[in-house]
Amino acid sequence: MADFFLMDSFDLAGRTIYLRVDINSPVNPVTGEIMGTDRFRAHVETIRKLRDSKVVIVAHQSRPGKDDFTSLRQHAQVMSRILNKKVMFVDQLFGSLVNKTVESMNEGDIVMLENARFYSEEVDLTTLESMENSNIVKGLSTLFDYYIIDAFAAIHRAQTTLVGFRRIKPNIAGALIEKEVTMIDRFRHLNESPKIAILGGAKIDDSIAVSENFLKSGFVDKILTGGVVANAFLWAKGIDIGKKNRDFIIKNNGDYEKLIAKCKGLLSEFGDRILVPSDFILSPSGERVSANGKIPDDQILADIGLDTVVEYSEIIDKAKAIFMNGPMGIYEIEAYSSGTREIFSSVAKSEAFSIAGGGHTLSALDKLGLTNRIDHASTGGGALISYLSGEAMPVLEALKESKRLFEV
């Protein structure tokens, strides 16, 4: 972490702090209420370290066009409850009301500004120069002394409130980013083998991309698949996964033929290192079937079967490092939760260094009471995968550049 300024690099007491967090959360489509608080709680340590500062929180929720693209007013209320401290909300990101509010703040006060993505400058600007000349940066930069970035789940984004201030004010890594980078770098640089990845859930494109990177780079020795990810690889192997399962992949993936072709290519090159389930539990019948037979068109592959659990658990038991992203099936329904429960429990019992990421993965771990038995439960989904895949991380690059510019 020597490349970044950390929170103990400066005396922040009495200072006005711009704190960029990621509290983007699922919203109940019926009631409009925030459904999870994990991302709020992840930032508590950083905020408490700023108890003697004036803290201005900047964040986003969803993106334009989505049903959950909402104001952050409710987010401020949720944060207030978690901190047991008033978090004032201002329905602007910049402007006269923000200026007046920040100028009247006392030490210990916390203010949350409006959803950054309500403003086109947040997502439309692509160059640092255009960001620095934006109303967002010009409107906010005169109000604060230091910029703290704690939004690990957004480190793969190059957006104005995330990277646009790096040459304007010292950019500092918050406690969450410090912890995330430390733990993930430990995993990345672990030289012990075997290393395995467990990839499940429904996000096929992400899992295929990470599979390709992990296998071609030699980062992992084996990949164990489950969920819709496994279904895609089975389809690529020429196995009849049934109409309902094919239709789900087609409906939820734009260029599904390209994805299946990519799966075929990976199987051709790394076939013995990509494991697919040998048996399944069907829904709604509840029948256990072999993966080699034809799956009835009216049935869903809802969970992995016992033979797969035994095979995967033996591999997990011998692993030295494990990355897991995505459940093995429809874990939310008790009848189809066994595969996820058994595989995640095997990881928890393992002596391997383990990292988990992705919203459904963390939700399943929490439901099973296993979160504290995983070495690191990351707040990042796409960000975690991108970082592990060796892609450029704009926020981390901004932190490095800012330290070079402002280091005395």
Curated annotation (Swiss-Prot):
Keyword Manganese listed: no
Catalytic activity, as annotated: (2R)-3-phosphoglycerate + ATP = (2R)-3-phospho-glyceroyl phosphate + ADP
Subcellular location: Cytoplasm
Pfam families: PGK
GO MF terms, alphabetically ordered: ADP binding; ATP binding; phosphoglycerate kinase activity
Gene Ontology cellular component annotations, sorted alphabetically: cytosol
Gene Ontology BP annotations: gluconeogenesis; glycolytic process
InterPro entries: Phosphoglycerate_kinase (IPR001576), Phosphoglycerate_kinase_N (IPR015824), Phosphoglycerate_kinase_sf (IPR036043)
Gene3D superfamilies: Phosphoglycerate kinase, N-terminal domain
Keyword Hydrolase: no
Sequence positions that bind substrate: D22, I23, N24, R39, H60, Q61, S62, R63, R117, R157
Functional pathway: Carbohydrate degradation; glycolysis; pyruvate from D-glyceraldehyde 3-phosphate: step 2/5
Binding site residues for ATP: E332, G358, G359, H360, T361
SUPFAM superfamilies recorded: Phosphoglycerate kinase (SSF53748)
Family in the record: Belongs to the phosphoglycerate kinase family.
Protein name listed in UniProt: Phosphoglycerate kinase
Source taxonomy: Archaea, Methanobacteriati, Thermoplasmatota, Thermoplasmata, Thermoplasmatales
